[in-house]
Curated annotation (Swiss-Prot):
Phosphorylation at Ser-385 increases the nuclear import efficiency of EBNA1. Phosphorylation at Ser-393 is required for interaction with CSNK2B. The N-terminus contains the region UR1 that binds zinc and is essential for EBNA1 to activate transcription. This domain dimerizes upon coordinating. The Gly-Gly-Ala repeat region (GAr) inhibits the mRNA translation of EBNA1 in cis and thus prevents MHC-I restricted presentation of EBNA1 epitopes to the host cytotoxic T cells. The chromosome-tethering regions contain Gly-Arg (GR) repeats that function as AT hooks and are involved in EBNA1 stable replication and partition of episomes. The C-terminus DNA binding and dimerization domain (DBD/DD) is required for the viral latent DNA replication. Transmembrane segments: none annotated. Residues 620-641 have a biased composition (Acidic residues). The lineage of its organism: Viruses, Duplodnaviria, Heunggongvirae, Peploviricota, Herviviricetes. Coiled coil: none annotated. Residues 379-386 are annotated as: Nuclear localization signal. Its EC number is 3.1.21.-. It is found in: Host nucleus. The record marks 491 as: Interaction dimer-dimer. It comes from Epstein-Barr virus (strain B95-8). This is Epstein-Barr nuclear antigen 1. One of its GO terms (biological process) is positive regulation of DNA-templated transcription.
Amino acid sequence: MSDEGPGTGPGNGLGEKGDTSGPEGSGGSGPQRRGGDNHGRGRGRGRGRGGGRPGAPGGSGSGPRHRDGVRRPQKRPSCIGCKGTHGGTGAGAGAGGAGAGGAGAGGGAGAGGGAGGAGGAGGAGAGGGAGAGGGAGGAGGAGAGGGAGAGGGAGGAGAGGGAGGAGGAGAGGGAGAGGGAGGAGAGGGAGGAGGAGAGGGAGAGGAGGAGGAGAGGAGAGGGAGGAGGAGAGGAGAGGAGAGGAGAGGAGGAGAGGAGGAGAGGAGGAGAGGGAGGAGAGGGAGGAGAGGAGGAGAGGAGGAGAGGAGGAGAGGGAGAGGAGAGGGGRGRGGSGGRGRGGSGGRGRGGSGGRRGRGRERARGGSRERARGRGRGRGEKRPRSPSSQSSSSGSPPRRPPPGRRPFFHPVGEADYFEYHQEGGPDGEPDVPPGAIEQGPADDPGEGPSTGPRGQGDGGRRKKGGWFGKHRGQGGSNPKFENIAEGLRALLARSHVERTTDEGTWVAGVFVYGGSKTSLYNLRRGTALAIPQCRLTPLSRLPFGMAPGPGPQPGPLRESIVCYFMVFLQTHIFAEVLKDAIKDLVMTKPAPTCNIRVTVCSFDDGVDLPPWFPPMVEGAAAEGDDGDDGDEGGDGDEGEEGQE
């Protein structure tokens, strides 16, 4: 058993024992999908290279927890996993441990080790300390012995030690050294149990940032027994915070992803959460899927120091948002309806004071989007929600049912876009669109467009579209939509204009989400020069279900619509079908766009338009008529966009 003597290293996941039985294999943390989003959303499925028993599942890795991917507590992937092992493959762990550390500690070895008492001894004995073996003895860890500094510590060293997580379990685990070491070994963390023991939470124990780092958080066990998560988990980076403050730590453990999740979250909730947050550790937690946990109760935790938690992407989510950290760079961020920070650069971030921040940040890619969200909910001239909340309820948060709908929509009021694009010359793209990066065609750059100047200043410069309100040009995104529409319209060739040029028919398009409608509207403009489009606006509320108060006639909902004016009824029908077919193939918000045909008995007299240069001059390729039916009337600009 003690074949190779005490296992050496901290178990970088490679099982440096040479013999596969070393539980050392605890999972390494594998390059945790470090993907583009730095803020370790790292769901990390650590790859756990474990040489360990076959039993040793890869660790759960916690994803590089910080932008630079360094795992805070210690840079080596402190074998993150051997999650299940400690209890799991009872034999596995035991045996495995045995293998390496098994050394003397033999007790630690196999079930025996597992045995509380035996384990205790093992842990106690240097043997326990012995690399994995000791850890394996996890049991040792279990016993207060495990807690024992050396014992626990050693265990910690070997992934097995982690296994010893049990040790952590014992108050002993909490014991400084003991806990810490354990933490070192992923096992430590793993032995969520360890964390479990108050000991784990215990300062030093928690300190075993490693532990936290380790699957500790990962070990669902760890995360699970909120406690477990607390101790070890918190230990994770959070551990730094005395173990994330007991439970809080757990949240931090979140890093373990698993830990963070579920119970972990709870931990976050507890003040502990705050503590964890405090330490960078907190952030770590956020990093792991733990973030998820954060979202839940974690959120509460976030409230407190949670801010730190916020740091982790997850953190950002629920709680994080809450805490100042909220902004966190995490994507979830905004979720937190917390007062929180203005949301770092994360996607949802802004969080701002009203939970659903203004998602301005939306395109992480785009540098500009950076912090820009209305940080603290401050000047938002008219928030749709507060607008007319008839009740005296604090207008700040829309009625419960409503929030989710906002989110996807990219919430600002429609009009806010004017203010926003402004000077940066990315005039007309509502936040959703921004995701595309600066797709706006450069031609639209200077805020007043080439021609605006000669305009006699007819309207304020800047604003949404560089030139006049409503002359958005083409750009690859809208062109794409237009292409789809043209293809569908090509199915039937019908008259689109009449000699009278009166606008007697229309298509009313509504639903979906504001951004999807907006984009469809811009696409329609490119596809059908013969139509005229109203700006996007909002539908009023209809009836309240059941008896009871009905909405006021003026009450605006957040559902948008726009109208397409056309000259022939037949083309209106064709266009309706085309739009229906175009949106039904698309994903969520878009496919919910609804269309219906209208007809205007006496037609709608759209005001005549004269090309801008000189009254009546045939500028812009228009034929100088009153623009009523000149097909390219107001789209004339398109060419020079």
